[in-house]
Amino acid sequence: MHCRFKKKKVYFSSCCGTILITYITKEARYEQSDRNTDRTKSQICFSGESEARNKYTFFAKVAKQEGYEQIAAIFEETALNEKAHAKLWFEALSGIGSTLENLKNAASGENYEWAEMYAGFARTAAQEGFPDIAAAFEKVGEIERSHEDRYNQLIDNMSVNTVFAKDSDVRWICRNCGHISVGAEAPLNCPVCSHPQSYFELVSENY
């Protein structure tokens, strides 16, 4: 698919030290011939429905804060509808695979975001005299890089069958009831609530 890119100015405001990014510097415009393909139409629909879902979720929070519970509920309900629509178009794009395939897809997307997208946006913002916005792009890029690292570790775990089995005794916790088991492998079933092994994860204390 061929794309042309059109630059626009980057504007930002700050409040209490928080940078508000009001515009991303590039806007893709598809060739007219590409607009007529089913795949491109599905991509446009998926992007639009995904954006609407997030937007309505944000709107619902504002409505709750302002005391409009019914309006918040309507925004939330519509957001769920948009999520269902997005899934429809994403499936049409063959975007959902096995867990291992999905992890590889996610890692690839995160790599693009930090290595190319945010890095490029940061350079452009710096060149155009917006050091604060450049720093914001760089910081978000660092987060996306950590996301890629996490996905790659999970890919490695799945590839060598160490999701539920380790080389030495570790502590496993049931995500359903909180039972903690010690061993090289997670229990096939939780001895307390009987949930399957898939509910176990390594204990991670961050307090």
Describe each model-derived feature in a short phrase.
Residues 13-14, 33:
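Serine residues within intrinsically disordered or low-complexity segments
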Residues 1-3, 21:
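Short, low-complexity, intrinsically disordered N-terminal modules
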Residues 26-207:
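Non-heme di-metal
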Residues 7-9:
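Polybasic, lysine-rich low-complexity intrinsically disordered segments
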Residues 3, 15-16:
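Cysteine-centered motifs
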Residues 11, 18-26:
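Short, positively charged and aromatic/hydrophobic N-terminal segments
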